Structures are given as structure tokens and as C-alpha cells.
Regions:
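Solvent-exposed interaction patches of small proteins and small membrane subunits
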Residues: 1-142
Length: 142
């Protein structure tokens, strides 16, 4: 578990660093950059919920996931205090699922706006909290 947790935390750190660069990029004028942002978001979200599951199973000993789905992991993570805002995480999950079916530019731009306005910060805060949990960093300020 420690190796998986540590590896996922390192991946999350790298991905969050890349997402943090989005405001400096031509996201809304370059389709390639837009698509890259949305792809990075999907990967970052997936690494995050899998990191939650690693902690729930490895540290908290919770192994009775009927499905092990992201929705279930988010709910159990909120209950156990790993995340504060399960509604935002469920919104991110919905967006992640919808991205596979977005084919028009306007919908992609709306998705990118949500990522840039809300989800980049939420993912970065989650990473900081997990870094602190692992003893790698200082806690974020509310």
C-alpha cells in the first residue's frame, strides 16, 4: 500500500502542477490545449479517487466496498474525513464521465471553465491534504 500511495501522490503532484499552468495557456483559443486540459483533469481526478481508495483500504482498513466505484469511494472518503466537499467531488465525477461524450466545442469550453474555476483548486487542496497526511508538507489553510 505504501508504494502505491506514494506513487499516486507523486503522480498527483505532477498532474496538479500541470493543471496549475492552465490559466497561462490559450485554453479557449487552441483546441489542442483545451483537449489537453480536459484530459489532464480526467487523469488527475482518477488518480485522486484511487488514492482515496488506497487510504481507505490501507490505512483505515475499510475493505467492504460493494462495488469499489468512484462514487462509493467519494462517499466513504467524505464520511471518514478524507475530503470536505463530497458534492464537489461528485460534480467532478459527473464531468469526468460526461467528457467521454462531449463532441462540441461549446460544451468542451464550459467543461474547461468549470475545471479552471473550481476543480483545479479542489484537486490541489486534496493533494496538499494528502501530502500533509503522509508527512510531506504543511496543511493548507481553509
Amino acid at each position: 500500500m505504501a508504494l502505491s500511495y506514494s506513487r499516486r501522490l507523486d503522480q498527483l503532484h505532477r498532474l496538479n502542477g500541470e493543471l496549475a499552468e492552465a490559466p497561462d495557456k490559450p485554453v479557449f483559443t487552441d483546441g489542442y490545449v483545451l483537449s489537453g486540459l480536459l484530459s489532464k483533469f480526467k487523469i488527475c481526478f482518477d488518480v485522486s479517487w484511487k488514492l482515496m481508495k488506497d487510504i481507505l483500504v490501507g490505512e483505515l482498513g475499510i475493505v467492504d466496498f460493494p462495488k469499489g466505484s468512484p462514487r462509493e469511494v467519494i462517499a466513504i472518503s467524505a464520511y471518514n474525513g478524507l475530503i470536505d466537499d463530497d458534492e464537489m467531488w461528485l460534480e467532478m465525477l459527473r464531468l469526468r464521465n460526461e467528457l467521454s461524450h462531449i463532441y462540441d466545442g461549446d460544451a468542451a469550453e464550459r467543461a474547461a471553465r468549470a475545471v479552471m474555476d473550481h476543480y483545479i483548486v479542489a484537486l490541489a487542496n486534496f493533494e496538499k491534504d494528502m501530502q500533509t497526511r503522509e508527512g510531506r508538507g504543511t496543511p493548507r489553510r481553509p
